């Protein structure tokens, strides 16, 4: 046990490891009514340059489904969650292989209301910055071309509409996602920590409004994109 914790601290840092372990314990003891959620926010530059060449010749197909598409019956998200996302005007691209679900990526060109905590995400500037979330690929397909093909398609779509950036949130413990986003030129944009105690939610963030406490209302976090895509690290 000590060795496992030591490796986690070495990989993610003492604070992030502590927050993660506390969340696991609190969630388990409270039947998920008490949670401590830690998020990093990143900005990724939009580019019309494809990662995958000759994508049309591959067996994996990428398309944008309507809300009533039967493919959603195969995806690992409840029907109510999918319906709420379309209600919020979110869009997604789905990857399929031989008509079977492989993965998807969701994004919003406007505000987005989080489904893990009470929070409204507002990417800015309008028409320049989008919000992407819930990138999922079936475990057996994660070493294949599904993710880069999905990412290419989102980039093409947003680039054609004039977008320069897409923002996203990532758990500091999700090393794979952090590594992937850094390879895409992601820039760290802030952090937020949510303590959920049944109906009470306490937020502390490096971004305005910095501190928010409520039982019903949700904080609104404005995520401002970097000045220029050329500034990416």
Please place each PLM-identified region on the residue numbering.
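Conserved acyl-donor/pantetheine-binding loop and adjacent beta-alpha core of acyl/acetyltransferases
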Residues: 88, 96, 100, 104-130, ...
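Conserved active-site alpha-helix within GNAT-family acetyltransferase domains
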Residues: 172-190
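Conserved acetyl-CoA-binding loop-helix of GNAT-fold acetyltransferases
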Residues: 131-160, 179, 183
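Conserved catalytic-core motifs of GNAT/GCN5-like acyltransferases
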Residues: 42, 187-202
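Conserved GNAT acetyl-CoA-binding A-motif
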Residues: 158-170
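Long, compositionally biased intrinsically disordered regions
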Residues: 217-233
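Acyl-donor-binding surface of acyltransferase catalytic domains
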Residues: 1-73, 79-81
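Catalytic micro-motifs at enzyme active sites that drive phosphoryl/nucleotidyl and oxygen chemistry
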Residues: 80-84, 118-119
